[in-house]
């Protein structure tokens, strides 16, 4: 307040009290000089006027992280480090986990669901950054059931309102094929089964693109299709030594799991290749089957676009044409009965009507006269 002495700097008597947080100060209103500062401690009489604030109404409860959430955040970071993801991926996955954990349905969920939530947040982050990681790979690391994981994954995506991009098949093929143990000789892999990585990867990509163009990938898990395409690519590079090797043995040599639908995808790919081979005259005379067509995969892929167009567009139209029998052609002799209503459609003038009536009457009279004996 004014009247409490003078400012030592400017000599003004306009001194006012100003509370800086909990510390009172005497400040000159003219120059802003702090004349005196109060102490931070309070007297016993001041403390008697204070009120107790319950913990539930303070900010400390909202800032505290439960043990379950702390454990989940550690699991997210550990999983990102095991997968060797960039640091930005780890931060994004942690943020998604914290957002999901704010929902009461997630906080009250069972421990199994919270464990799966860790993998879902990491998978969402990888999908958004186009990082080639499959749901099956995370399920293997977490020992989680694939059906349970997929249902919780869709629930989290919907809960957080995320827009997930489609998985890039090319990047997934590169990552998945790199894990095959077929690129260097070992006691478990004979020399005739060892293949160059770049050649095998290039042909596998072409076969996967062929499967995508012929609707073998849409709505299906990608790994069985990639496994079948990798097997065919590996066989076609050295068919003389590898045609006798089965898909199950191939997966065992490559040290990868055999997906259950991979055998069905293999048969579908072979059926597509056979239809393409029928469009080449020099292959049509060889009467290829699903075993021998593997030898000519390189030639078929070289002309893939034109052969697919011929096999699945013109071929479909031809099948539809064969299925429909042409209507029988009736021979017109001129003796067919023509109804009166049809004849009247062709009469235009009154003279034509009169001529038609006279001709009709003469015909009736001729038919009513009996024939002479």
Curated annotation (Swiss-Prot):
Processing after translation: In response to oxidative stress, a Cys-residue is reversibly oxidized to cysteine sulfenic acid. This impairs formation of a ternary complex with TBP and DNA and down-regulates expression of target genes in response to oxidative stress.
Positions contributing to Zn(2+) binding: 7, 10, 28, 31
Superkingdom, natural source: Eukaryota
Region feature Interaction with target DNA, mapped onto this chain: 108-114
Keywords, alphabetical: Activator, Metal-binding, Nucleus, Repeat, Transcription, Transcription regulation, Zinc, Zinc-finger
Region Disordered: start-end pairs: 318-337
One of the GO BP terms on file: transcription preinitiation complex assembly
GO cellular component, one term: transcription factor TFIIIB complex
Pfam families named among the record's database cross-references: BRF2-like_C_cyclin_rpt, Zn_Ribbon_TF
Ranges annotated as TFIIB-type zinc finger: 2-36
Compartment(s) of residence: Nucleus
GO MF, one example: TBP-class protein binding
Sequence repeats: 72-157, 173-249
Subunit structure: Component of TFIIIB complexes. The TFIIIB complex has two activities, alpha and beta. The TFIIIB-alpha activity complex is composed of TBP, BDP1, and a complex containing both BRF2 and at least four stably associated proteins; this complex inhibits the transcription by pol III via its phosphorylation by CK2; YY1 facilitates the TFIIIB-alpha complex formation. Interacts with TBP; this interaction promotes recruitment of BRF2 to TATA box-containing promoters.
Known function: General activator of RNA polymerase III transcription. Factor exclusively required for RNA polymerase III transcription of genes with promoter elements upstream of the initiation sites. Contributes to the regulation of gene expression; functions as activator in the absence of oxidative stress. Down-regulates expression of target genes in response to oxidative stress. Overexpression protects cells against apoptosis in response to oxidative stress.
Family recorded in the similarity comment: Belongs to the TFIIB family.
Protein name as catalogued: Transcription factor IIIB 50 kDa subunit
Species this chain originates from: Macaca fascicularis (Crab-eating macaque)
